[in-house]
Design a protein with these regions (language model features):
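Catalytic activation segment of kinase domains across protein kinase-like and atypical kinase folds
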Residues: 17, 22-68
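S-adenosyl-L-methionine
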Residues: 232-260
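N-terminal auxiliary segments of SAM/dcSAM-dependent transferases
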Residues: 54-153
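Conserved SAM-binding motif I beta-strand of class I
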Residues: 217-222
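Conserved class I S-adenosyl-L-methionine
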Residues: 192-202
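Short alpha-helix immediately C-terminal to the canonical SAM-binding loop
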Residues: 228-229
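Conserved SAM-binding loop and adjacent beta-strand
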Residues: 154, 168-183
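Conserved SAM-binding loop of SAM-dependent methyltransferases across substrates and taxa
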Residues: 203-215
Length: 260
């Protein structure tokens, strides 16, 4: 979400904008987010509104909010809708206390109301849009920066999980853990893999050891979202070529989406 907003801010300064806000336009390369959909770029037209706002909320903001406010992991919800979490649905889930926030009220409650009006009377909506006043570029920029500031402060609540605190709760004593670290380090030094896949990466401890000892790239996989989040923090903090993926190998994601 932050990467997308940073890119939007960068583009707007160059008088360009994005046509949409799909989360799938961002992939990861060497552990870092990269925007890949060049065809989404277009020239900024004076007074235009953010066309991808609704999609940004569904793909980025709403999944973060449902984790921050309701402690619900969003990952499996994307199976039901790869376009993300519907704003009208999120508005129904949130309670009155959640909605007191100015940001939540603005981006969820009000937007939900407008979307429902669009559904009830689409002709009137088209007419209103044609009569809208121009949206100043300064207002456009302020909206992007305000969203970035808010989102950067959101913290996802972590449920208790099996491997979320792997460093504290595992089957190794100090000696056996040290032996395993040496075995992994020696193996990686000998093989020198271009790409290594760590299945059941836990907190990413051995993924990092692999990179430190010669693996050029590591893909770390686990079904525990807390473990994956911790691994990503390690990757980000140490600037590693490490990509953590939330995957349950006993219940893999189906082949779905465009042309599937």
């Amino acid at each position: 979400a932050i990467h997308h907003l940073n890119f939007q801010i960068f583009l707007l300064e160059l008088n360009c904008v994005l046509r949409d806000s799909s989360a799938f336009n961002i992939q990861f390369y060497e552990g870092k987010p990269i925007f890949i959909d060049i065809m989404s770029l277009k020239k900024y037209e004076d007074g235009e509104y953010w066309g991808g706002y609704k999609q940004f909320c569904e793909n980025f903001l709403n999944p973060l909010l449902i984790g921050h406010l309701k402690n619900i992991e969003h990952n499996n919800l994307f199976r039901g809708s790869i376009e993300g979490i519907d704003t009208i649905l999120l508005n129904k889930i949130l309670n009155f206390k959640d909605k007191i926030s100015f940001n939540v009220f603005t981006h969820v409650v009000l937007q939900s109301k407008f979307l429902q009006q669009d559904i009830k009377n689409p002709k009137a909506t088209v007419k209103k849009k044609n009569e809208l006043q121009k949206f100043k570029k300064t207002s456009y920029m302020f909206m992007l920066k305000q969203l970035k500031s808010w989102i950067s402060k959101l913290e996802l609540k972590k449920n208790k999980s099996i491997w979320g605190k792997y460093e504290k709760y595992n089957t190794y004593n100090e000696k056996s853990l040290s032996e395993k670290e040496k075995i992994v380090a020696q193996f990686v030094k000998k093989i020198k893999p271009n790409k290594l896949i760590d299945l059941g990466c836990n907190n990413g401890q051995f993924s990092k050891i692999s990179i430190d000892n010669g693996a050029k790239e590591v893909v770390a996989v686990d079904f525990d979202i807390n473990a994956i989040s911790n691994t990503y923090e390690i990757s980000k903090k140490n600037n590693l070529n490490l990509l953590p993926l939330f995957i349950d190998l006993s219940n893999p994601s189906p082949n779905q989406g465009w042309r599937q």
